[in-house]
Regions:
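N-terminal, polar/charged subdomain of small-to-medium soluble alpha/beta proteins
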Residues: 1-105
């Protein structure tokens, strides 16, 4: 799985990129078949950076979440929480489809 981190309107340190990478890698716990994760840090408002994450799984549309607050890592935690909810909901739908198919047979 590939993780891409980009910034708009400024730069972030390598240490910050490493922390973001470590946090984002945890998304794989929820869904194994991921091709890439794109993280965009928008520093347009210096006091409120915006974090946007696109998760690209195999054979499905992207999961996307964003959040803006005064704390960059707090925003990242909120985004990851939103993504976790989206992925769990998707997995539940897949499981329900499987049950319905087996009941019809």
């Amino acid at each position: 799985m590939q993780i891409n981190i980009s910034t708009r309107h400024g730069d972030i340190s390598d240490a910050t990129k490493e922390k973001i990478t470590q946090k984002v890698e945890k998304v794989q716990r929820f869904f194994e078949r991921l091709t890439s994760i794109d993280v965009t840090v928008d520093l347009g408002k210096a006091d409120e950076p915006k974090i946007e994450v696109h998760v690209r799984p195999e054979k499905r549309d992207d999961f996307v979440a964003s959040y803006q607050s005064g704390d960059m890592f707090g925003s990242l935690d909120q985004v990851l929480s939103k993504l976790e909810q989206q992925i769990k909901k998707h997995k539940e739908k897949l499981q329900e489809r499987g049950k319905n198919v087996s009941e019809d047979v």
